[in-house]
């Protein structure tokens, strides 16, 4: 079994060795390279497919040979540098390949593609075969450049640097490619054979008959493919024809002669060097360290890449003339034909590739992006030679130059094994020394030495003379971190006076060592100038440098002209000539031939690395149009912004001398299309841009698929869960509403598609927009002034002919009301009489507002409100239309034509109503007559003839009566005729029975069509009532008469007939009441609603006023009393002055100033926050603010409240958490329980070592102080500034409150200190020690202790993010005023708010240039208090957003005086306030607090709550205060904390001071007239936002918001916008609910719902260096709750029970037993410094006994090896008294090449081009208990 396993293991290892061998890997990569098929296969396949016969066979062979030869040359070029440079020159393809392709295409296009002329039997003489060979060879060489090589082919270049035998790898990869190519060609041959043998294809007669035509067609297909390749290739080359040249004015600096000096070169070129063979094709190697020192800085940078004739050369390889002058180069006056051709055609300083221009807000040029850290070079790592791809290019170049001049024999003799052994021995020696030192320090602690003497201190430089004072931290080269600074060199005036300015410009200093190292330098100039100097003796101290010169001379003696001394002079060391030359070499300065005198210069030149920068400084299109660019920049932009149309919406009418285009206001209308320009530079080849894909119809931000993981909605799985839930419940509750919404959406989509089709139809017409615009203008004029007046005239003439009164006035009033507004193509209103810019090209729309419709008659205006309300509800039609080219009107641009209101429809409707009414009346009469006739015939006993006569008589009588009303004379004649034929008896009877009672209500005429619906109902009811009454009276009389004639009737019949009239009377009464109720109901309802509204609102006003007044009075009284009692106890004498001042200040309280800081902190607050909607938070916030402001307070009475673990009854949880976070209160730890945390062995191990938490006194001694500038020789100097209250550890409150008198404390404010420690401690603790489960909570308190309305879960039920996102989970920034901005992390997934528009529109008294140009030479202690804010607008009370408060650079709490603070002139009168809510008009001072304080009461800074402050800003001399204008994405306010480099004199002339610009902008932008104020008011309110809204979140809000914005733009351009505003509101075009959207959706709610995101302004808060010292000394931070203190050591401690993730610094932890001198174990973090700590870790990991452990992860190694590598731990087994297990220290160290990988990843993650961020990649050890 053992043998089998052994053989199996050998077999596996053998297979692994074979697989990892160079040959197999080369074959594999070569085979994969076969799939890199490009245009070179075009000629090869053509020869294989089309050629036939013997000549065809020869052509196939020649094509294959040329193809393989070309591929072999490409593989050789990978290793052979000259061939690679020859094929990889940037302009080779432009000069050679493109003309060859075009010539080949046009030459073969006019003749038969396969006709190569006459052929002979001799193949070598056949020109066609040679052409085939050359074509395949050349195309294979060009294949690498025509199309980008595939990823598989690029892998060859990567593996080249990982194998040792490179030539074997190249050969094997070529063989692999050849095998793959043969297989591919065999497959093609099999396919062709199958096609030829296929009967279905061969039997086609058409193909057989037209074989020659088919061949010609195939030839044409190949020609077309070749032409497409040429066209596609045209866009990928750096062509000088299509490349846009940047203007010379765009270059950085103020001179235009930058391009001429460096472009000159000679024909001499270094060949065959090792640098060429290694072939750095895409790197920009820095030059030698000994480059020219006084080269013009405005010229090209030293590290810039210079390509001439395709050879990448550094500046060292050029030949310059020796004598050049600053600002006056020799080649300044060259003409264009005197320059080299390539430098004339191609500008190497500009962007040919589609690179992104990274904005630089400083006055510097942009860093070149292609200067990456990927530079391959061999170096020694871990004692062995390895290839590093992050090697400094400048160092490699300098090393090669040194190696060419001198040999290093000592290093060459040693082998690699000996070097490695030496390296191991050195590391072991260092390891032993560190272990001994470490053990000595531990033993010293056990013997009882003072802890500060045991801890390792950082080495400092001191004064050599006195040895008493340290060198200042800034100038100490030993210190690291922020203490490292650049010393600003200054030349005394006496030295400057010695050197005249002319001589200073003419002289040029040349370094002599640089002259020695460069081979092409003329050394004869040296010999001519030796006699200028005096002969002095040679210094004996510098003899070792002389030997170096001798070695240089011997190594370079073979070269001509490089011999420094003659052979005779080389023998003696002390020869005079050698001494003379040595002095000349070190001290001499070459001068110009015109001036042979030696000039002295007292300028210190230090070695520094210059960052490679571009020669141009470009501006974006947005900056150019907004006027935010600097004065020194060009007049045109170079960076393309997002495509948009600028619409001028306001232009000043009165133009003064100072008025310019900048005063115009414009609206940017962005087209709804993807932004593929992406901040590209003009002239860059956009075709070369790859990695940008299109995966949906409209992409707002086009980006690479590499960033798809940062998108919230994935393209394939995008589900809006809340919206789906809403639709589900909506459909469950009611099916009809869901169907209705669905149908409306479908109709909208159909309308949009139809409008798109109409718009696309215009594109087929030549000049579509111009044609359509002219037609629209003609249609508008025709409609307004011809068509409509003609219709009005015809209508009124017709009314006159029909005997109706004309309506000239009404019609022409409506005609005048119709307005035609000219809009842009997208519908943005511009003006009524002015055409927009470029309207002839872009097109216009004409919007008809209040369109005129011809009506047959006009309704009466004197109508009741009820009827008008009903008519308005009935006639809800759009009040505007867009005019079409055919004269019709549409509601949308290019929409469908809706039906017009008809002129004859009301007339027909009125006739139909009258006909229906007449018909109904006739039917009623017939029905009544029928019923009465039937009843009468049943009851009466008379004959039918008598009854018919009586009925006819009554009917004739009724007709007579009606006729009498119409014409009395005709009735009189009829009456006489009738009376002549009747007897007197019947006449008397008829006269007696003809009386008919009229109604008691006067009936109006039914012909009046102006009666309302209510009047008609009343009239109908009155008619019916009067008719019924008449009938009942008539029936009663008839019954009474019949009863008298017949005698007494029966009882039953009499009672039945008696009840019927009673019932009729009751019905009459009910109808009468209903009539009155109908008439009075509407008025009653309106009066009732108004009365209730007034009563309730008055009560609300009185309650709010009384409560607010009582609240403020009680607060003032309580705190005045409290301050009075306290001051009487402490200092009775100063009470009167203080109280009087405070009372005066409280009277000057202004609530408007508090809203500024509140709204600013809203923008920086988190999303998941708790909301408070009760006003009691105001009083509690004020109470505890006052408590925290007092210097010393005894909180014994409040201690029980704060230490209560349950739900507090008298204190809100948020306020308690606030004071616990601020460090004011601390509660007990004994009731705190750990929830959902897994305790690892590191925490358990630290529980037994609590004794090593130093006390506050000792930690305060560790913190450096200002007076500790002397060297501590005998021990630590006692701190004399400590008082009793500071050393009393139990009373921590005194320590917190006496900061002003406590001089030892390093930071100026406890809050800032606590914040920094809180964030850094938490981050470091989580990164090293924490093991948090996915179900863990990060909040204030556990979920079980909080109720539903008290949870403040900042990461509650949220997926755990990366470790770097832990800073977002810290809720402490809700409670801080300053210093919290720099610690906020920006989420890259967000769409950020465009602050450019906000800041551009929000400022009224600002000069834009003042923000961009600041004074570098600011004075000391410059006060920028109130005067700094005069340039900003007064914010309105109802404003949506507010400005940012500029925080202090450094605060002085002692000098802060509570003065009335007029922040940004906020106490001025607000211009034209419009109250959108009535309840806010009664409380104008509470308007800012209306929506802010309810949501988050803690975000309002306590210092601005009920008092005002006057903040000061003290700017020191070394601090620069800059404001910069924002880019397209965001604004940066950067506070520079470092010294700038020396600027040029011309550059300083271009900068203006901040104070001068501030005075100018006050005078320039002052408001003078009322119209301007109205425009600013409108602009401030409704034109301050630009957001991206998701339609799924708030449906229909986007469209309504955009429509409102368009109306705002149109209103800004009007002189009197009030009337138009009212009319826009009436026609529902201006939505009032969006105007007051801030009352419905606060900024926090909008942020939560994802409508828009605000990017907070980053302020670089000054970072004090004391905190860095604390990080160095106390790295191991452990939370107090992680300790389990024994009972005998338990003392009173203060801890926050609600914050489980809070880490407290070590020096704040109270020591349980200070006099205890027993120490168990000390970790390296507590003793050694950071540098020594890292050194110890690395040396411990380098174990010479186990060589394999260097490149492996030691965590997976054997534990025995770990125990042996850490011997000092084995000796301390007895130290851990609580645990019996052994403590083992496991170190995790990555190999060196992994660190290089991290350094390369560094460039991607941090977007840096240098190694400044490499310090982030520090790997700390992990401690584990075995």
From Swiss-Prot:
One of its GO terms (cellular component) is chloroplast inner membrane. It is found in: Plastid, Chloroplast inner membrane. The keyword Transmembrane applies. Residues 1042-1057 have a biased composition (Basic residues). Its main location: plastid. Residues 250-308, 1032-1057 are annotated as: Disordered. One of its GO terms (biological process) is protein transport. Part of the Tic complex. PANTHER family: PROTEIN TIC 214 (PTHR33163:SF40), PROTEIN TIC 214-RELATED (PTHR33163). This is Protein TIC 214. It comes from Daucus carota (Wild carrot).
